A protein has these predicted regions:
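Short, ordered loop/turn segments at secondary-structure junctions
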Residues: 61, 84-86, 159-160
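Short glycine-rich phosphate-binding loop at a beta-alpha junction
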Residues: 53-60
Length: 185
């Protein structure tokens, strides 16, 4: 089963994937789709064109191509990625915990002290590919706050399910959640 949708002016078929017995989601994947990545980055930048911000910030992994393309198109020299684990090159990393609809159990997000120091006092736009329960977005926001940054906006390609009702995010397109038979909940 697939769900047909248009985002950033492009038509795509999203495979419908089981999360639980009564919850299925449309899998939005930019990996390997250069055309979609470029178009979504362009339109995400339009959402914040009047926003004063210093840096873009996301969590690995599916949003990495998007944030890179957003930086390329906007001329930004630096962006930040919260990692799912500490890396040897991260001096004195800080971290927060997160629960995501697509990740089993608790996941931690890490940021090296060097990046945290660059974020301190800066205006940050959080970006994610899909906002669903808001767990990943909340964890990113907590990590930015822990680093001393100021979140000025939250953007995503898609708002899934109840996230469409949120007033604190901007997004390019809505994405419903599905029943086992592929019908919209």
């Amino acid at each position: 089963m697939t769900y047909s949708m248009t985002v950033a002016g492009l038509q795509r078929e999203l495979p419908i994937c089981k999360i639980t017995d009564d919850l299925y989601i449309g899998a939005f994947i930019c990996f390997g789709d250069a055309e979609l990545t470029v178009a979504c980055a362009r339109d995400l930048l339009k959402l914040v064109e009047n926003e004063e911000y210093d840096y873009l910030f996301t969590a690995e992994a599916k949003s990495i191509p998007l944030i890179h393309e957003m930086a390329r198109q906007s001329g930004a020299k630096k962006y930040f990625i919260a990692r799912k684990g500490p890396k040897a090159y991260m001096p004195d990393p800080i971290h927060v915990e997160d629960r995501s609809i697509t990740t089993a159990g608790v996941q931690k997000l890490y940021l090296g002290r060097d990046d945290a120091d660059m974020i301190r006092g800066k205006r940050i736009v959080l970006m994610d590919d899909v906002i669903s329960t808001g767990g990943s977005l909340h964890a990113m926001e907590e990590l930015v706050k822990l680093a001393g940054g100021i979140v000025v906006d939250r953007i995503a390609v898609l708002a899934e399910g109840d996230a469409q009702q949120r007033k604190d995010i901007q997004y390019l397109a809505p994405l419903p959640v599905f029943n086992a038979d592929g019908t919209v909940k």
